[in-house]
Amino acid sequence: MEKLVDDGLANAIGLSSFNITQIQRILSEARIPPANLQIELHAYFQQQQLINFCNKHNISITCFSPLGSPDIGQFFSMFGESVVVPKILENPVVRDIATKHNKTSAQVLLRFSLQKGLAVIPKSLTPTRIRENINVFDFTLDECDMKNLNGLDKSPAGRLFDLFVSKGAKKHPEYPF
């Protein structure tokens, strides 16, 4: 990747689903430090320690599944898998804040991450939801809203994509990814 940057074929190097130990190893061995880390991050899995580490090392963060992947259960059902996914969008705290601001739960969750200085990449297929996801810059969550949303963190127990990782992968020396 460093050669791609040197050759002008890439502007920066990014990482995906790395933990602190893995990033430390990259920082100690790489000539060009990573510019961005893409990780699962949402109200139930906030990863504050990893955010603090990245901030200290000038690594921006992009949140995948900022809405908690509400439709992922349907995806797995196509393969005969039954996966119960927590419905962050239906959480009463999130809904109350959405009502207070006359916004949707999705808009509140996106705004929550944005106010923390994080980039978000929600997956949406419908034009209505795509427009809804863009309309998050006309309101601000107050200190009480942020505190209540911060209180939803379940730490590692809130990780959704752990539900979908094969049992064999969990034995890998680099796990969790």
Segments the model singles out, each with a brief description of its role:
Residues M1-F177:
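Beta/alpha (TIM)-barrel catalytic core signal, keyed to glycine-rich beta->alpha loops juxtaposed to Asp/Glu
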